[in-house]
Amino acid sequence: MAIQQNRFADVPAESHITESAATFIEQSRYDDIPSEALAIARRCVLDGMGLYVAGTDHETTVLLAAAAADQAGKGEALLLGHGDTRVPAASAARVLGTSGHAHDWDDSQVSIDPDHVYGLLTHPTIPPLTASLVMSQARGGASGQEFMLAFLTGFEVECKISEWMFSQHYKRGFHSSGTVGTFGAFAAAAKLMGLKGDKLRHGLGLTASLAAGIRCNFGTMTKPLHVGRAAENGVTAALLAERGYTADKQALDGPWGYFAVQGGGISAEKLE
């Protein structure tokens, strides 16, 4: 496979990862989910719910919940664990996502690539689970199958991006749960919202520019906020894309796309 180069990254010259991701999000169906994946997903959801409860009274969550309540806005989703206060979906995602990572107890994706630091990639559950919860509320509810499909769609997108990207991403100081988690949240929200075609492509481009989190903030309140912001930004990208907001439709690909800029490139072998 030919390699397209810039000074900082090596990426496949003819990759179509953005298109593949958009197609996967649009075409994924509940009936196609393997039973083993559903069993794992149920465990992840239960674990995530426990993490939300555990993180509700953590100082970082309490401060964020108070700020979200003060800012108010359209009451789309509950600030879970904080009474009956309802706030915009993106604000609820920020608070809930942060509570899920407040104690750093959430599950981990283990890499098949020994080059990845500690053999770990990301904490994959909380961003797509949070996006699924808040958007289900914002859109008036979802069936159990719709909810699980959205969650697993986001989970799969997040884990694939984490595995395919070079390990330089984490070594350069990015916190992958905050960065790559944004894609998981976007995919989950977009699936529940029924986004299709170019709205998915633009949404992935938006997500690529919103994905953030740096490791110097480990040990502070801001580390769990990375995951809260991943959930918030993924939801925001989906909502903006639904309205027709535009971005580069191949933002995961190319010499200046997400993989190149934040990860130094992508493994061509893993794409084959």
Residue ranges and their predicted role:
Residues 2-272:
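N-terminal core-entry segment
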